[in-house]
Amino acid sequence: MSKVLFINASPVANEASFSYQLAKTFESEYLKLNPSDQVSWLDLNELDKGSMTLTSKNSKEHFKDENVDPLINQIKSVDKLVVIAPMTNFNYPATLKNWLDKICVANKTFSYKYSKKGGSIGLMDHLKVMIINTQGAPEGWYAFADVTVLLKGVFEFIGAMVDSIKVAGTKVEYLNKQPKEIVEPNLALIKEKAKNF
């Protein structure tokens, strides 16, 4: 039995969020294949620490154990992480950045101690991560802002194995469609990813 944690970083209300609807479908398909797995959700929009941005004025406070350990221990306690991360102004949402700043902590989720070549060693090698990303523009329009690539790099840095589901063109290809309507044309991909997760 695996423990799966869904991280919702969408700044859009659930019923209007393309990425959230894809994630709920992924959850449903995943549980059909893994009915005994335990699923929980963390909505970063509801997390007080999710709105605490790292600045020069609060860096000591930001990295205090009581601020980072609960979030780090939460991902250490699960086997799989599903990250809902729509492109927002050419990046992932600010709440996700704030959360990542709290879980990417030296000697807790990565280390330089035992590296032979001066690089880092990820300490979260037990973790499988599925990134669910949507963007309004078609694929390739904004190569400098590929949220999936950015997040893949961050999670691989801490040692995780990473896969992704990306749906591009929600403001073009899927224009005038409701979030639930983008699930159907992407259902085969979602089922395939759920099967291999």
Curated annotation (Swiss-Prot):
EC supergroup of this enzyme: oxidoreductase
Keyword terms, alphabetized: Flavoprotein, FMN, NAD, Oxidoreductase
Signal peptide (UniProt feature, chain positions): none
Cofactor(s) for this UniProt protein: FMN
Molecular-function GO term, any one: FMN binding
Keyword Oxidoreductase: yes
PANTHER family: FMN-DEPENDENT NADH-AZOREDUCTASE 1 (PTHR43741), FMN-DEPENDENT NADH:QUINONE OXIDOREDUCTASE (PTHR43741:SF4)
Protein name: FMN-dependent NADH:quinone oxidoreductase
Organism name: Mycoplasmoides gallisepticum (strain R(low / passage 15 / clone 2))
Gene, per the UniProt record: azoR
